[in-house]
């Protein structure tokens, strides 16, 4: 009997039934299919950056909205970064900037200060330093939810692209929203004027639009411009309303520095927030700030790079400036950091990084208030002016915030006008 059982087992092994062979084959094919799908997902996931926690600012969303030109600009930019990294392996202070393909582990090894120094190329200004923290957050404006947020006079959507072959800046004014919502006047039509600063050269005037609350300009202008002029020139977009007496009345203006857009490498497209032209005269200097957000670490980094042309309070001829950065949530101060004091310098170079822990879920409820102040003997400091940056700000404050969200993990630097308190 034992021999018969052994022979039966041996026969099953040598010549298994047909249905068992089918089961084994189906299982093997299923495993191969699962492995193939997994490998395909891993391969395709390397084609784009990690998904953003904010879908509206995901890279694929921008490519879909603005076309393949964004993808082409990105492909041009990556070899340029790689070339910079390869050509700067000498002194540590001249390390190349990280590309978007660098892993999070390599970023963590660098540390936030070295990473920001690489991206901004701040070697001429010295080593990037960490800011000081301030404990006191008590002030009258701590409970204000509208501090420094200027009333906007509508928005305009523009795009710009620089043709390096013909040295031409192509500007498109696409559409506008809420352009003539003003209580003190009534306008039935409007038009837009584009000027090149600082020469006040008019480069284009749009056709008159009758429906000024939601309109499509669809205007294109070409401006001959040398590459070196991109570092010095600005564009001013001015909207004029036409009243009952057919007079042209300025209803809003916005200025955009070409140096902050990196136009030779990539086009720019976005919404600009118009402001009252009279408020533009309240500027008491300019400040260069860099923002970046790392979603994996939930870390917002603000770099106070430098300021220029500061105007002191009370007609003083000299002062010792420093900068305070407040993190606001719904207008309330959540955190405060400040830079070191620079002695008697209207054009101070700070080059200090400030790191805030910010969960992604509350990022859209936050804003930054950057205050330039004068150091005093009693330690309080007199405020010179401020800048508001965030989703509820206006002008360049909103543009800078949106650009940061559109390029997560990479620093975005812009100049801001410091407005009088």
UniProtKB/Swiss-Prot annotation:
This is Synaptotagmin-12. Residues 1-18 are vesicular. Synaptic vesicle phosphoprotein that enhances spontaneous neurotransmitter release but does not effect induced neurotransmitter release. Unlike other synaptotagmins, it does not bind Ca(2+) or phospholipids. Essential for mossy-fiber long-term potentiation in the hippocampus. The chain crosses the membrane at residues 19-39. InterPro entries: C2_dom (IPR000008), C2_domain_sf (IPR035892), Syt12_C2B (IPR030537). One of its GO terms (molecular function) is calcium ion sensor activity. Residues 152-272, 283-416 form the C2 domain. PANTHER family: SYNAPTOTAGMIN, SYNAPTOTAGMIN-12.
């Amino acid at each position: 009997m034992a021999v018969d059982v052994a022979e039966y087992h041996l026969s099953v092994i040598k010549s298994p039934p047909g249905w068992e062979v089918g089961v084994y084959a189906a299982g093997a094919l299923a495993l191969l299919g699962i492995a193939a799908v997994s490998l395909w997902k891993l391969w395709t996931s390397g084609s784009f950056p990690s998904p953003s926690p904010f879908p509206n600012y995901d890279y694929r969303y921008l490519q879909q909205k603005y076309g393949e030109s964004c993808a082409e600009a990105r492909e041009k930019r990556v070899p340029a970064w790689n070339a910079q990294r390869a050509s700067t392996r000498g002194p540590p202070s001249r390390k190349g900037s990280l590309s978007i393909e660098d892993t999070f582990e390599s970023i963590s090894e660098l540390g936030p200060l070295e990473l920001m120094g690489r991206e901004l190329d701040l070697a001429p200004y010295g080593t990037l330093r960490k800011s000081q923290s301030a404990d006191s957050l008590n002030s009258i404006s701590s409970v204000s939810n509208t501090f420094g947020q200027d009333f906007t006079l509508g928005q305009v959507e523009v795009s710009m692209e620089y043709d390096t072959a013909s040295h031409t800046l192509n500007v498109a004014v696409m559409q506008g929203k809420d352009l003539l919502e003003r209580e003190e006047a009534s306008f039935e039509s409007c038009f837009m004027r584009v000027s090149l600063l600082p020469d006040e050269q008019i480069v284009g005037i749009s056709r008159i639009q009758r429906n000024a609350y939601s309109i499509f300009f669809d205007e294109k202008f070409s401006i001959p411009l040398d590459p070196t002029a991109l570092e010095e020139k600005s564009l001013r977009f001015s909207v004029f309303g036409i009243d009952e007496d057919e007079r042209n009345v300025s209803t809003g203006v916005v200025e955009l520095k070409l140096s902050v857009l990196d136009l030779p490498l990539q086009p720019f497209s976005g919404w600009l927030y118009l402001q009252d032209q009279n408020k533009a005269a309240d500027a008491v200097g300019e400040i260069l700030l860099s923002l970046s957000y790392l979603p994996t670490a939930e870390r917002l980094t603000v770099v106070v790079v430098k300021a220029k042309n500061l105007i002191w309070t009370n007609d003083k001829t000299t002062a010792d400036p420093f900068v305070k950065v407040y993190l606001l949530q719904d207008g309330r101060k959540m955190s405060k950091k400040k830079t070191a004091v620079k002695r008697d310098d209207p054009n101070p170079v700070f080059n200090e990084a400030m790191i805030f822990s910010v969960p992604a879920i509350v990022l859209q409820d936050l804003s930054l208030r950057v205050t330039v102040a004068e150091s005093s003997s009693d330690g309080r400091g007199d405020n010179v002016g401020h800048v508001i940056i965030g989703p509820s700000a206006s002008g360049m404050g909103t543009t800078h915030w949106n650009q940061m969200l559109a390029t997560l993990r990479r620093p975005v630097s812009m100049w801001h006008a410091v407005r009088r308190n």
